[in-house]
Amino acid sequence: MACGSSLGSVDMNSIPLVALNYNVRHRLSLYLNPNAVVAAGWTQLAEEMGYDYLEIKNFERFPDCTMKLLEDWEKKCFRATVGGLLEMLKKMERNDILTDLGPLIEADCMKHLEKKNAPLPLQDDKVDSSEQYRITKSDDPSGSLPETFDAFICYCAQDISFVQEMISRLEQTDYKLKLCVFDRDVLPGTCLWSITSELIEHRCRKMVVIISDDYLDSSECDFQTKFALSLGPGAREKRLIPVKYKPMKRPFPSILRFITLCDYTNPCTKGWFWERLAKALSR
C-alpha cells in the first residue's frame, strides 16, 4: 500500500484517514466516481489500496463507490492515513485533486491535530479518562491513535513457549512484525470478550491460531477463532492463519480445514516455516 506524504506544514503520514470530514470525502467522490476515459477513477484507487477484482466489483452496488471505498479501507487497513491516500492519488496522476482539495485536506488535518492536542476536560478525580480508551499498554490515552498490530495471536496457556519463540523469530529479527500477545500487551481489568473482539476486528490485520490438543479445550480460543471466521466471507482466508507446531493426538478442528495450514511439524518444510509465516503476515 501507499506510504505517507506531506502537504504544507502538516505531516500527513501521521494523520489517520478518519480526520477527513464529509465535505472532503464528498468532493473526492465527485472527482473519482465518474467513469472518465482520460483520468483514473475510484477503481484504480481501489487497486492501489490492494483490493482484488471481485472486491472492487462488489463496491459497484453502492450509490457512492468512492465514499464506501474510503470507509472500508480505513476499517481494514490500520495503516490507512491521509498521507497514504495522497501518495496513491499522486501515483494515479490525479494532480487536479491534490491541487483543488489540498487546502481543504490540510484544514481537516489541522483540526484533527488541534482536537488531539486539546487539554482533556475536567472530571471526577476518581475516574481516569484514559480508562475508556486504553486497552493495550501502548495505547494513546486520548484515544485518537489506538495501538495496532500485524497479527493477533490466538493461543492457550500451555502453548506459551511457542508464542515466545514466535516473538523472538518475528518481532526481534529483520521481519520486525508487531504481534498482539494478550498476556503481554493487554491491560488487566478490561472485559475479556469485548476487548478480544475489538483487537481482532479493528486493531489487527491478521490472526494466527496456534493449534494443539490444548487449544481444543480452550473456550477463549474457540471464541476468538469463531469470531474471526464470522468477519465476512471475503476476508476469512486473508485474515486467519492456522499454525500447528507439535504433533496432535486429537483431530484437527474441522472449521479450519479449508484454510492453508502452516505446519511446523513437517520436517520437509520446517526450514521455510518462519519465512512463509512472516510473509503471510506482511502482505
Swiss-Prot record:
Quick one: a GO cellular component term? cytoplasm
InterPro entries recorded? DEATH-like_dom_sf, Death_dom, MyD88_Death, Myelin_different_resp_MyD88, TIR_dom, Toll_tir_struct_dom_sf
What the entry lists under SMART domains is as follows: DEATH (SM00005), TIR (SM00255)
The record places domain Death at 27-105
**GO biological processes:** inflammatory response; innate immune response; MyD88-dependent toll-like receptor signaling pathway; positive regulation of canonical NF-kappaB signal transduction
Boundaries of every TIR domain copy? 147-281
Supply the name of the protein: Myeloid differentiation primary response protein MyD88
Cellular localization per UniProt: Cytoplasm
Which UniProt key words apply to this protein?
A: Cytoplasm, Immunity, Inflammatory response, Innate immunity
Organism, scientific name = Xenopus tropicalis (Western clawed frog)
Q: Which CDD domains match?
A: Death_MyD88 (cd08312)
Stretches the record annotates as Disordered? 120-143
List every stretch annotated Intermediate domain: 106-143
What's the gene? myd88
The record's domain comment reads: The intermediate domain (ID) is required for the phosphorylation and activation of IRAK.
